[in-house]
Amino acid sequence: MVVCTYKGEIKMHFNDREEVIALTPQWKGERLPDGRPKVDEKYLKALKTLTLEEVWKPIFVKGYESQFEGRFHTLHDDGRKLIGRAVTATYCPYRPDYDEVAKDIGRSEGRTGTYNQWVIDNLMEYDVPVIDMYDKIYKGTYLGGNLTTALRNKTKNENGGAVIWGGVRDTEQMKKVEDTQVYYRGIDPTPIRDFIMTGYNTVTRIGNAVCLPGDVVFGAGGGVLFIPSHLVEEVVGGAAKTQVKDLFGFEMIAQNKFTTAQIDKNTWSKEMLDLLMDFIEKDDRAAEYRGMDWSHEYDLAINGDPNDTQSAL
C-alpha cells in the first residue's frame, strides 16, 4: 500500500503504478499497465526446459540468497512447472478499524468483493498470484474451485497457477482446472474469513523468500524460486550453460575421460573447455547451445586461481 498526499489530503492506495516502478528501478524494459516489469514471453517459454538448480545458480552467485522456498504442498505431483509474472498480495488477521479503512480504499478504487477477489479479478495473461496469507489455513483458504477457474481464464497460461503461503479448499475441483499448478501450505474445508489486505503489488515475503511484483515465478522440483525481473535474461543464459556442461560432463564421466572431481570444479581447465566447445559444435544434442559466449569461462581457466578446488554450485 502506498500513501500519497493530494492538496494536503492523505490518500492511500493499493496496487499503485508509481510504487511498483519505484520498487523495480533496475528493470529498463517494457512495463505492464500496473507498472510491473513485463518480462518477455520468450524467456518464460525458455524456462520450461530448465531445472530448479540450473535457474537458481545464476541468482545465488549474485547474492540473491532469499529467493527460494520449498515448504509447500502442490496441487499436482506430476512434475509440471509453474512459470509466470508475479502479482503480489499481503494480508493480516482481521481488525475491525483497519478493515473499514482497507475496504474504503478498495471502494474508492472501484474494487468489489472480498480481498482475494480483488487480486483474481485483475489478473492478466501470464500472471501468477503470489500470496502471503501469513500461513493461515483454517479460514485462510485463498483459492477454491471457483477462483481457480477464474484464475485460469484470466491468465491463459499453460504453466499457470498460484503460490499461497496459506490454505486452499475444493482441491478435487481445483485439480480439474487445466494447466494449473498451485503451491500452498495446507488444505481446509472452511471458506476464507477474517483477513485484511495490507499490500497489493508490493514487497511480499513467502516463508524465507522475498518476491517483488513482476518477478518471474518458477515453481519446479518441489519448491518456488522468485527470479528478479532484471536478471531473467542473464539467468536463462547462465542456466543454459549449466545445462550443456552437465550434458557434456555426464558423457565424459561415463567414458572415464574426466573424474567427478574435475567435472565438479567451479572453474574448468582450458583443455576441458576446448573439449566442451568441440562437443557443442559436433554433437546434435548440443545444437541449441551453439553460438553462446564462453569468453568469461576461458578467462577464468587461463587467469583464474589454479588452486581453486571449490566445487561448482
Please tell me what each predicted stretch does:
Residues 1-11:
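Short, Lys/Arg-enriched N-terminal segments with co-localized hydrophobic residues
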Residues 31, 38-41, 45-213, 226-275, ...:
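Feature captures the catalytic cores and cofactor-binding loops of soluble hydro-lyases/lyases
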Residues 12-30, 42-44:
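Short acidic, Pro/Gly- and aromatic-enriched capping/linker segments at domain boundaries
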Residues 4-6, 28, 144:
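A broadly tuned, weak detector of single residues within folded domains
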Residues 27-28, 208, 221:
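A generic hydrophobic-helix recognition signal that picks specific residues
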Residues 33, 220-221:
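Short acidic-glycine loop/turn motifs at beta-strand connectors
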